[in-house]
């Protein structure tokens, strides 16, 4: 079972985003979709629902409302959390890294 989410370092999370996520995602409002969807407003949004992005049926059918905790669960192993997702990222195994990244995303995607 994944570790419970705890607020992390937004600064470290920003660096993780730049090195692990930026090649496929944007965070700013109105930002373009890339290989992955724009993440603006991700917390509170239902999986597979970013306007204009072509999701797999698996993402659409998962029907999870993204929270800090289930983002942490997902980011530990995306293909295990949503079998059939096209997200190629293998995951962040360290809870601290997930906490830092999610703390950054919460702020950067509002």
Curated annotation (Swiss-Prot):
Its main location: mitochondrion. The modification N6,N6,N6-trimethyllysine is found at residue 79. Binds 1 heme c group covalently per subunit. It comes from Debaryomyces hansenii (strain ATCC 36239 / CBS 767 / BCRC 21394 / JCM 1990 / NBRC 0083 / IGC 2968). Belongs to the cytochrome c family. GO terms for cellular component: mitochondrial intermembrane space. InterPro entries: Cyt_c-like_dom, Cyt_c-like_dom_sf, Cyt_c_1A/1B. One of its GO terms (molecular function) is metal ion binding. The gene is CYC1. This is Cytochrome c. Heme c binds at residues 21, 24-25, 87. It is found in: Mitochondrion intermembrane space. Electron carrier protein. The oxidized form of the cytochrome c heme group can accept an electron from the heme group of the cytochrome c1 subunit of cytochrome reductase. Cytochrome c then transfers this electron to the cytochrome oxidase complex, the final protein carrier in the mitochondrial electron-transport chain. Keywords: Electron transport, Heme, Iron, Metal-binding, Methylation, Mitochondrion, Respiratory chain, Transport. Signal peptide: none annotated.
């Amino acid at each position: 079972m994944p570790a419970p989410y705890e607020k992390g370092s937004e600064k470290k999370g920003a660096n993780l985003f730049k090195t692990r996520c930026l090649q496929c995602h944007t965070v700013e409002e109105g930002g373009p979709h890339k290989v992955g969807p724009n993440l603006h407003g991700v917390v509170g949004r239902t999986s597979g629902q970013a306007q204009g992005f072509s999701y797999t049926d698996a993402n659409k059918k998962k029907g999870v409302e993204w929270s800090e905790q289930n983002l942490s669960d997902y980011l530990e192993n995306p293909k295990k959390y949503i079998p059939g997702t096209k997200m190629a990222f293998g995951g962040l195994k360290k809870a601290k890294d997930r906490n830092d990244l999610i703390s950054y995303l919460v702020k950067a995607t509002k």
